Amino acid sequence: MVHEVVKNLLEAEYAPQRSEEWLRLRGNMLTASDAATALGTNPYEKPRDLILKKCGHKKFDGNQATFHGNKYEDEARDIFCAQYGEVAHEIGLRPHPDHPWLGGSPDGITESGKLLEIKCPLRREIKEEVPVYYMPQLQLLMEILNLEECYFIQYKPAEITWPGPVEFVVVHVLRDRQWFADSLPVLQAFWEKVLWHREHGCADIMPKTRVSKTVVALAEPPKKVCIIMDCDEEDC
């Protein structure tokens, strides 16, 4: 039996991933993956940098860590479904029903009504807990999708852990409605800053260009030398 909320999510239409429509929609939203930065709890990105990105001044095409994570995401999902007896589906970018400037793309939703969020860290140590900077993403996704539970999946394949064992950790997270009530005003204020800077420009938050100073070593002036010479009384 498919959960009623999941059934509605699966029947909805979504823009294809990476399509022009998907990029346009995403550019006009504060997404779940942006939430920690907007709230100031992401140690890897400053709020100012996210504003610049949303205004088109910064572009992120991925790095080694994100490419690695994308490479093993499907594998991690399959392992989870096999171990937990779940059936999972992927859906596209979903706006919040009441706040359409908020959106998110889950890594999966199960037919039993759980959100899946998958992380395949390249170097970070996996612990049996959710890193604080990922919790806003999970909570916002549960709000957007109207789901009450989430499985936070962390996976390191043999390619990374060899000669040690594969690492696969699943943390169960419950929806926290109070978190959303407390965070919504902060997220909205941040989004209003984005809209303001889109209209007025970003000159006031652009990183200052560092001017390198060239230090020229000047030659020291010649020292005055006093020479005392012996002389005869007739010469002095």
PLM feature segments, named:
Residues 1-236:
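Accessory terminal regions of nucleic-acid processing enzymes
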